[in-house]
């Protein structure tokens, strides 16, 4: 049964699982019902639209007038060459925002991404195919590679490049896929809390974790506009929420301590159901429990110390009264 509260439960757990070099899972929980999708959906959108990447924005090919032209000695027409070119994923090495790169190939040759690697740029999908030229052909082209976010259509790029260049649709985002699942998770015997499982796949320009961090930063920056008028004390709000949940372990059942049957039965008979009840006790009170022997006493003391609540130390600080009240509510 869910209790009435005055603030939403703050998630306390996060896991990052690197599935492979370009795939990662970010798992966070527990969230109040409805909060998980409220956060996951915009984060997914921001992963696609705000993550910085690189893309070819224009190409100039010797002997070619426009994108519907053909080139003697090349298997592909110019349209197919451009499609293959846009499938290559570039990464500038020198933190530059824009580079013009010159290429020259003599046939016979099958050209793939690895052939475009040089001191300026790296192709992160080096096996991707570009073109084939025969023994009589020579392929020379200039390529503009830029740094950006999201998608920019060729019509907009055409406005600022030289007329001899062919403008390209620029797909900057390095995020190939971002999907999330919302799962239920149990908190304080309530199964209605939620877990976000976000899977991020990138093309290799950046790692999935870098992309995720960038989306979080973008969300913070976009939300900060409201603070210009409302003057929200974000640090105070976070501190308040963290204080309310920092001892959440104490609201778990003593069953989670994995005590021996003798020790657990002794606590059960004393109606001690929550870990927090042990944390609130003095060692002398624990010793006075009926039928609690020295072996069980030592076991409970060791387990409580292991989870950060040793007897004889004031680990709860000013949280004691709030914890007593919460446990009383749970047991009522």
UniProtKB/Swiss-Prot annotation:
Q: Alpha N-terminal domain (alpha-NTD): where is this region?
A: 1-230
Residue segments, region Alpha C-terminal domain (alpha-CTD): 246-332
Q: Name one GO molecular function term.
A: DNA-directed RNA polymerase activity
List the catalytic activities from the record. Answer: RNA(n) + a ribonucleoside 5'-triphosphate = RNA(n+1) + diphosphate
Among Pfam families, the record links this protein to: RNA_pol_A_bac (PF01000), RNA_pol_A_CTD (PF03118), RNA_pol_L (PF01193)
Recorded superkingdom: Bacteria
Q: List the disulfide bonds.
A: none
Q: Which Gene3D superfamilies match?
A: 5' to 3' exonuclease, C-terminal subdomain, DNA-directed RNA polymerase, insert domain, RNA polymerase, RBP11-like subunit
- EC category name: transferase
HAMAP family xref list: RNApol_bact_RpoA (MF_00059)
The name this protein goes by in its record: DNA-directed RNA polymerase subunit alpha
């Amino acid at each position: 049964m869910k209790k009435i509260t005055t603030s939403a439960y703050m998630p306390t757990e996060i896991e990052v699982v690197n599935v492979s070099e370009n795939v990662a899972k970010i798992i966070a929980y527990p969230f109040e019902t409805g909060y998980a999708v409220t956060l996951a959906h915009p984060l997914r959108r921001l992963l696609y639209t705000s993550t910085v990447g690189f893309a070819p924005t224009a190409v100039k090919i010797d002997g070619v007038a426009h994108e519907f032209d053909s080139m003697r000695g090349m298997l592909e027409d110019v349209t197919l060459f451009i499609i293959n070119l846009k499938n290559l994923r570039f990464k500038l090495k020198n933190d530059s925002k824009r580079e013009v790169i010159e290429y020259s190939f003599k046939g016979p040759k099958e050209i793939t991404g690895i052939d475009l690697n040089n001191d300026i740029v790296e192709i992160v999908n080096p096996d991707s195919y570009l073109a084939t030229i025969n023994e009589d052909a020579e392929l020379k082209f200039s390529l503009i590679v830029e740094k950006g976010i999201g998608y920019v259509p060729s019509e907009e790029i055409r406005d600022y490049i030289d007329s001899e260049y062919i403008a390209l649709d620029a797909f900057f985002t390095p995020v190939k896929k971002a999907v999330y699942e919302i799962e239920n998770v149990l908190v304080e015997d309530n199964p209605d809390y939620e877990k976000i499982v976000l899977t991020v796949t990138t093309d290799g320009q950046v790692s999935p974790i870098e992309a995720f961090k960038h989306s979080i930063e973008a969300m913070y920056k976009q939300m900060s506009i409201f603070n210009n008028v409302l003057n929200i004390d974000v640090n105070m709000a976070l501190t308040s929420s963290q204080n309310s949940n920092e001892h959440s372990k104490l609201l778990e059942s003593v069953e989670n301590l994995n005590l021996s049957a003798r020790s657990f039965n002794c606590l059960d008979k004393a109606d001690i159901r929550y870990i927090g009840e042990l944390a609130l006790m003095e060692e002398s009170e624990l010793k006075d429990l009926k039928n609690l022997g020295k072996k069980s006493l030592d076991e409970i003391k060791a387990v409580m110390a292991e989870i950060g609540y040793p007897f004889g130390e004031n680990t709860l600080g000013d949280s004691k009264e709030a914890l007593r009240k919460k446990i009383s509510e749970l047991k009522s």
